Amino acid sequence: MAMDPTIIDPAALARLEEWGGPKLSNEIMRLFLENGPTRMDQVRTALTGSDLDLAERGAHSLKSSAANIGAEEVRRIANDVEIASSEGQLQRVRELLPDLEEAFSLAIRELEMNAETSNEA
């Protein structure tokens, strides 16, 4: 089953496969599935304590890993969270969080469905 290109950019995954074969792209996707929730929790926890430095670090990590797999909406919003955090805009970060959570959930769901389909093949 092909991934939804509005959620995961197939060109990003193709680049990973070009650089390191299917094993690399599968490993990068696995790492996103494994570590992404921790990064999202880091941003949420940071906002609970109004810790913008922690929010910035979590958003930066999430942005980078999302870029690797082509989760462009996650990357874009995480970038906005990172910038707002670095500028001390706590309210803006709080406003962005629901959008980031939604985009992240869609990306995770898409990767999980793809992993299930790949395992069945």
Language model: regions and residue ranges:
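Two-component system phosphorelay core
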Residues: M1-A121
